[in-house]
């Protein structure tokens, strides 16, 4: 059963109905429409915290989707689920796969930086300063890339880069 038939969320239902209308109007192959349908259902399940169902839908969308740009967003969303479940290594794998297909995906760059920063904090708490420094430097590199692509976003990251001396204020853009 399509998710919109069992979903009580008004905004999600509205998105689903609009997506169905767009799919009917735009020229797309049956496979492209099916891939988008799975992607849409994955987003719906993910927004409700139904991560196993979301992953099933995303994997099916990934199997069907041929467009690299669209595949990058599917991979990105899979990475989001793994990150939210604390599976950071898997999340990094999917974020990197998304970036391989679409290097202009600031949220993926930001999320990679967040994971490295988190690993740096954990290493610092364990007094492993060398690993902490390495992780913080990796986080800085990914945040710099994200900021270059979306200079008005990631304000906290920009402040962290400045306060830690990892980026001079004049080199942000």
Curated annotation (Swiss-Prot):
Topology versus the membrane, per the UniProt entry?
Peripheral membrane protein
Q: Which GO terms describe its cellular component?
A: chloroplast thylakoid membrane
Q: What is this protein called?
A: Photosystem I assembly protein Ycf3
Output the InterPro entries linked to this UniProt entry.
PSI_Ycf3_assembly, TPR-like_helical_dom_sf, TPR_rpt, Ycf3/AcsC/BcsC/TPR_MFPF
- Location relative to the cell: Plastid, Chloroplast thylakoid membrane
Q: Does the keyword Oxidoreductase apply?
A: no
UniProt keyword annotation of Ion transport present: no
Free-text function comment from the UniProt entry: Essential for the assembly of the photosystem I (PSI) complex. May act as a chaperone-like factor to guide the assembly of the PSI subunits.
Q: Which UniProt keywords apply?
A: Chloroplast, Membrane, Photosynthesis, Plastid, Repeat, Thylakoid, TPR repeat
Organism lineage string: Eukaryota, Cryptophyceae, Pyrenomonadales, Pyrenomonadaceae, Rhodomonas
List residue spans for each TPR repeat: 35-68, 72-105, 120-153
State the superkingdom.
Answer: Eukaryota
- Principal localization reads plastid
Q: Which GO terms describe its biological process?
A: photosynthesis
- UniProt similarity note: Belongs to the Ycf3 family.
